[in-house]
Amino acid sequence: MIKTDICDLLQIEYPIFQGGMAWLGTAELASAVSEAGGLGIIGAGHMPPDIFRNEIHKVKERTNKPFGCNIMLMSPFVKEVMQVVVEERVPVITTGAGNPGVYIPALKEIGTKVIPVVASVLLAKRLLRGGIDAIIAEGTESGGHVGDITTMALLPQVVDAVDVPVIAAGGIADGRGVAAAFALGAHAVQMGTRFVLSEECIAHENYKNAVLKAKDRSTVMTGLTTGHPVRIIENQLAHKYKNLEFSGGSKEELENLGAGTLRKAAIEGDVKEGSVMIGQIAGMLHDVKPCKEIITDIMTEAETVIKNLQTFGK
């Protein structure tokens, strides 16, 4: 069995994180991943604090294993949500869209592990000074909000730049990807798109079918001119957004067009006018399975790949 420093740090069986996806990173999915030995993560997104607290309670009812919460630091509820994290003594948080430094002292006091997501070496170095426990290097292959550096290029540079464990994210969905991430210095991997296609994910059937039908070139980047690019499946919404974006649309117009579109796709099932946030790896996914099977299959394959690689030098 593959064990890494991350497994010891977080007391998890397998070095696999489930991405904290807004609307889809629910208690049902997070608890299933944690029960299967990985780190399940509630995607707080823009959840009001009372709903967020309820999701935490539901996870605790379903599993006694470690879990995490992904906190978007630009959320209008971030202060209240962080207070809930402290009050509920959440074991792990991952963070995005900002610097968690101001919250770290209170989190350290209760033993919460803080793991920010970064898309550049510069940001990794900056956040390291705040006392983080590990860091997620997320490549542009990921779905949703992303940077512009690939995982293959970003990961080893972040590994070389920091002295905490690094988790690889972006473009990973099977044991081959896990083995490759380890070869580049990662101590764990984070996967979002693969867990969208799990039985426990609440994504609408249309959303899952859109992922299943996706090919290698099915996703596009929107918001490139705004400084906040988002990877989604190319559909009517993507075309409207890019047309508005590159014809001089204002920031307000773009925000209005994008507002509520993730829920429209993920929960309501409108995959034409909604935002289907998935990664480029979707083209190699062809089935929906329980989280436990996903994790055990991936780790078994990773062990086989690593073993087979050892024969190359003989």
Which residues are covered by each model-predicted region?
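Active-site entrance/lid segments in N-terminal catalytic domains of soluble metabolic enzymes
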Residues: 1-161, 165
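Conserved active-site-proximal phosphate/metal-binding subdomains
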Residues: 153-167, 173-314
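Glycine-rich phosphate-binding active-site loops on the catalytic face of alpha/beta enzymes
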Residues: 22-23, 38-49, 136-148, 172-207
